[in-house]
Amino acid sequence: MSHIIPYQILGCVNVRLAKFTAGTDVDEYHLTLCIDDKACHMSYAEQLRQLCAAFEIVRQQIKASPVFKRYFISDAANQTAMLMNYELTSPDYELSVIEQPPANGTQVALWCYLMTHINTKANTFGLYEVEHGSYRHLWSANNTAQAKTCSAQTKLLLNDYVMQLMNEGCTLRDNCVRTWFYVNDIDRDYKDMVKARNDVFYTQGMNRHTHFTVSTGIGSRQADNQIRCQMDSYAVCGLRQGQMRYLHAPEYLCPTADGMSFERGACIDYGDRRHVFISGTGSTDRNDDVVSQGDILGQCMRVWQNIEALLNEADCEMNDLQVLTCAIRDASDFHVVRQFLQKKTEHRIPYVLVNAHICKPGRLVEMECIAARKAKSSYPNF
């Protein structure tokens, strides 16, 4: 079951923490740290210092090990080096750094996924492994490739990932749960990225007759201005046939059979719990048309309905959400969207609200999330 740790402020850092426990060995935590509006005047160095100090306080309080961190920063070219000074001494979790500015005008935010009673290590072939029980969870982040076009970079990234998975005894088709593609110029290169992704998928037996992966494709710059695309990923080694299934909500969203090249969501059943991963979700209908064109609040409401429909298909509810990332295309929509999220979450769900270009111009807001629910099945425990 989920336990929401009381919302707190440490220095200038707003802390939101959700704990999930199934009463078995591994407890899970999702933590978001965001700089308070009142600290906008502080330097990046001071915001980062206070955020990292707050993280360490919370980590010691909950006595859990970080598995995956994602920093959202406002200027990757000038801020990444200082951030890495805090992170280079901690090699036992995966680290993602993306330029998606916190939407409240501050300069850095953090989402971190933590667990108890696990073993973590960096594997020889470049993936970070989290091992417990019958499973090995394989995380990868900040992957980039040297090529002239976004399409070529995407193919190189995915082909390299296919080989990394093969070296771990896994495949893209059977073990990859989720990918994130952060595209420098999403308005120009999104279609090329998608086509390149599909080209690699097809070589791995992934198509509209089989399945794709849960995914987010969204705008973000990297510290190196030659990088057109960055890829993060998550896979699970040890899954049995049928243990992961895909979510469609066809009455609300356009299905893969009609041309979508990513899964709207996926759920994985373990012996003691169910995990649900929801792709970046916009305000669209079953024909992939934008709902509430030009209306940010209307689009927020439709996104929420779409996510709820996907969760319901997995026999889950909005109360099962563990963490949510919300991106808005126009920073001036910040106050409306934050008020919407505050009303919907009531501080129950850790979230990060950032400013980023979304894959198609008419889509003003996009949300992705992770949910968990206590459940029993014949599969080994998480």
Q: What is the predicted role of each segment?
A:
Residues 1-322, 328-382:
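N-terminal presequence-like segments and the immediate start of the first folded domain
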